[in-house]
Regions:
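Recognition helix of helix-turn-helix/homeodomain-like DNA-binding domains
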Residues: 38-53
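A short, Lys/Arg-rich alpha-helix, primarily the initiator
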Residues: 2-25
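Short, charged recognition helix plus adjacent turn
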Residues: 2, 72-85
Length: 85
């Protein structure tokens, strides 16, 4: 049986903390990150605030600017590689 699913809120909170920590590691302000990502500062604030589910295109742009990849993981813990079915 698969482990219990984390709540969506937990996922968004973890994403917010991870992105904020990475931005701090790089010594960037939210405004600088937004400029690098080609998004508005409000997008960075929304992602880091973790209050709502952010738009995927904004998340992808910010992840790319942070030098990060987003990874899809099944509930069983397997990583799904691009192009896999």
């Amino acid at each position: 049986m698969a482990p219990p699913r984390k709540s969506r809120r937990t996922d968004v909170s973890n994403l917010a903390r991870s992105f904020t920590a990475r931005r701090h590691e790089l010594g960037l302000t939210q405004a600088e990150l937004a400029l690098l990502a080609g998004v508005g500062r409000s997008t960075v604030q929304a992602i880091e605030g973790g209050k709502d589910a952010p738009q995927l295109d904004g998340v992808n742009a910010v992840a790319d600017a942070l030098g990060c990849d987003l990874t899809l993981v099944t509930r069983a813990g397997a990583i799904v590689e691009p192009g896999e079915r």
